[in-house]
Amino acid sequence: MYFSYLCTRKNQINIMTMIPLENYPYTDAQIQERIAEYTRKGNPYMDEQQACRFILNCIDLTTLEGSDNRAVVEALCQKAIDFKDDARNIKSTAAVCVYPPFAAIAKEKLKGTSIHVACVAGAFPAGQSPIEVKLAEVRYALEQGADEIDMVISRGKFLEGNYQEVFDEIKAIREACANAHLKVILETGELKTADNIYKASQIAIAAGADFIKTSTGKIAVNATPESFLVMLDAIKAHYEKTGKMVSMKPAGGISDPETALKFVSILANVLGEKWMDNTHFRIGASRLANKVFDKIQ
């Protein structure tokens, strides 16, 4: 099926000739040293209260469970809406993230707000379906009202060195998304090494990702400061070469304000103030929002 799909595409791009995939320039020890340094420095652009407001406004409030239904999704959307408090200068979350069958429900519930509808699509979370099936699900989500698509790369193909097919799949989904934002999940817990994470980030960026995202939240190892830093370094290297800002989304396991503040401090120290808005930074979370909201004075 993949061969038949490729035969229908024009102007095939060879990822290996388009960009030379670079090895990650830091050792594991240097990664730890940098994380400690950035954590110690903190956020140079915001105090803690400002950072908590920023974090809340960057959350993709998420429900991705087999038990999801209309009532669950409508309640999630109402929760996202209710965080907004003009008197306390608190904005709503950036988006809600749901499975494609609930996109239309979320779209209707969020009508008249600034909150986007994000959908996981493309054989989330395993990515183990033919590209034709992935594209069909992405198109369905968009037809149902999704503003943003969160796809996951084919880790098995990446780990066997089939970088071209990984690139082609992301590129095809990018084209299907048209004006919708595409977040590309690397599932860093399965990629294992910093070098793999860095190369996968380069492939996703080259294929047109608007965001690169750490994790599905469906395996044991989700967003870590280490994987987050490696991905930020890939974004920074791309920006220094091209001037293009690629956005970042850690997701999975960020369930308390202290952890979220640490991630934001790393973001601020690596990429700077230009990335400090919800166009360029998101956090995927379900439990974090209430705790951050309660911390805001």
Where are these regions (language model features)?
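C-terminal alpha-helical cap/extension of soluble enzyme domains
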Residues: 17-59, 87, 243-297
